UniProtKB/Swiss-Prot annotation:
Matching Pfam families: TBSV_P22
Post-translational modification: Phosphorylated.
Reported effect, E103A: Movement defective. Loss of interaction with host protein HFI22. No effect on association with host membrane
InterPro entries: TBSV_p22 (IPR005332)
Protein task: Transports viral genome to neighboring plant cells directly through plasmosdesmata, without any budding. The movement protein allows efficient cell to cell propagation, by bypassing the host cell wall barrier. Displays RNA-binding activity.
Protein name per UniProt: Movement protein
Source lineage: Viruses, Riboviria, Orthornavirae, Kitrinoviricota, Tolucaviricetes
Annotated keywords: Host membrane, Host-virus interaction, Membrane, Phosphoprotein, RNA-binding, Transport, Viral movement protein
Subunit structure: Interacts with host protein HFI22.
Organism: Tomato bushy stunt virus (strain Cherry) (TBSV)
Length: 189
């Protein structure tokens, strides 16, 4: 799948106006394309799409993300797409790490999955694996960094995820034990 993104500098007010117009994606159902808005996930509204074909695929996903933190905070994170129709929150796609102190314009041409029109399809876009080199960057994020769309009126609970921004020293502590285990097994061989 081709993913393009750019990060540009613009005044926050201008970006906010652009983003409030709504992020959209194009859903292909059978032979027809239909634009679907991405809604902040604290709104429980789901969008109903005319289900005329057997399978639904997604293409031409365009997302504009305004800076949520100061660029000086140095916060980065990956944008995940998850199917939340069950508690596992199956990963459908993940971008590379993005600087969340800048505007992000993300374009995804085609996603490598399809879903049956007979099933409910709640999809959530959200930032995960957030990292900051500064201690102040830990508590800067909330549910507002998630978007959702769905083909059902049912409400779904989001899978549990860690929303705290990880401090880089903490990240190193998490990685060190696995490196030690690997070195012990290497020495015993």
């Amino acid at each position: 799948m081709d993913t393009e993104y750019e990060q540009v500098n613009k005044p926050w007010n201008e970006l906010y106006k652009e983003t409030t117009l709504g992020n959209k994606l194009t859903v292909n159902v059978g032979m027809e394309d239909q634009e679907v808005p991405l809604l902040p996930s604290n709104f429980l509204t789901k969008v109903r799409v005319g289900l005329s074909g057997g399978y639904i695929t997604m293409r031409r996903i365009r997302i504009k993300i305004i800076p949520l933190v100061s660029r000086k905070a140095g916060v980065s994170g990956k944008l995940y797409l998850r199917d939340i129709s069950d508690t596992t929150g199956r990963k459908l796609h993940c971008t590379e790490s993005l600087d969340l102190g800048r505007e992000i314009r993300l374009t995804m041409q085609h996603l490598d999955f399809s879903v049956s029109t007979r099933s409910d399809v709640p999809i959530v876009f959200g930032f995960e694996e957030l990292v900051s080199p500064f201690l102040e960057g830990r508590e800067l994020f909330s549910i507002s960094v998630r978007w959702q769309f769905g083909l059902s009126k049912n409400c779904y609970s989001l899978p549990q995820s860690k929303w705290k921004v990880m401090y880089q020293e903490d990240a190193l502590k998490v990685l060190r034990p696995s490196k030690k285990k690997a070195s012990k097994t290497d020495s015993s061989v």
